UniProtKB/Swiss-Prot annotation:
Belongs to the prokaryotic/mitochondrial release factor family. GO terms for molecular function: translation release factor activity, codon specific. It holds the Pfam family PCRF. It comes from the Bacteria. This is Peptide chain release factor 1. Keywords: Cytoplasm, Methylation, Protein biosynthesis. PROSITE patterns: RF_PROK_I. GO terms for cellular component: cytoplasm. Peptide chain release factor 1 directs the termination of translation in response to the peptide chain termination codons UAG and UAA. InterPro entries: PCRF, Pep_chain_release_fac_I, Pep_chain_release_fac_I_sf, Prokaryotic/Mito_RF, RF-1. The gene is prfA. NCBIfam families: prfA, PRK00591.1.
Amino acid sequence: MKPSILEKLQQLGDRLEEVTHLLGQPEATADMDNYRKLTREHAELTPVVEVFQNYRLAQSDLADAEEMLSDPEMKDFAAEEIEAAKAKIGALDTELQKLLLPKDADDDKNIFIEVRAGTGGDEAALFAGDLLRMYSRYAERNRWQVEIVSANESELGGYKEVIARIIGLGAYSRLKFESGGHRVQRVPATESQGRIHTSACTVAVMPEADELEDIELNPVDLRIDTFRASGAGGQHINKTDSAVRITHLPTGMVVECQDGRSQHANKAQAMKVLAARLNDAQKREAQAKEAAERKSLIGSGDRSERIRTYNYPQGRVTDHRINLTLHKLDFVMDGDLAEITDALIAEHQAELLAAMGD
């Protein structure tokens, strides 16, 4: 292990002792904001320090075993102990490096997930509906809530565009690598000749901003229009102008919300989505710069990149970023995404570890 990392771990151990002492003081709860901050820091430091303690114990065991090598009667036993200690040190070293990886401040946040139909017309819209169901079923498996924020339905079913809010601890950490182009290859229900068509959708996953204050929304930069909410095919479904369209003039971003019960609710939701989009745009710009520097395949934030193909005739799903192919399409479309998300997270961690080693 690098001396700089050992020094960092020693500093974290000292800091944990300091935080533990501060939390034990009678006046610790006088300032509840600071108390919560210290409690959170204690929870973050404890696992790192515990693993580091185990690492040092394993090093001590290795040193003891190496001393026994000089005793002819203990030589075989010592060799076994040395091998076991080295294996343990290697595993703990890897675990410590992962624990020291920079944390994404957005990982625990709720998300907005946008699915837009691309090339393929009605079939792309149907696939957008399938993707929304896939993410909704995945959310159910994790006991997260799903709310439809805005939906532009197509006449044959599915969505031209749909925005959902997924509420649950860690939603962003598990789904942030879903952003990008998703391609489907299958025989559409409307295809009489049985020919396979290729369609595409774009997915965008954005962490929900904690508060609107996270992004400064100057009223001068906003144009707010109201109109009547409409259903599939464009028919109006109410008689009041409850739907809201907000245009962010400096960037040209447009957000529409019409699924709320009132104009006020739709405006509030639209402002949240706009804040998330602006936050996300800033984050993607930074990610793209970092990714270019380290030639990253994961987490570049490039929405134009085709990241996954869903091939129905072959029953397979392929994630092109990590060359992962699974022959369990039905399960994946029913929300069984764990194998894919775990592999993407592992690859991202490997990239970060490689960057630490540079």
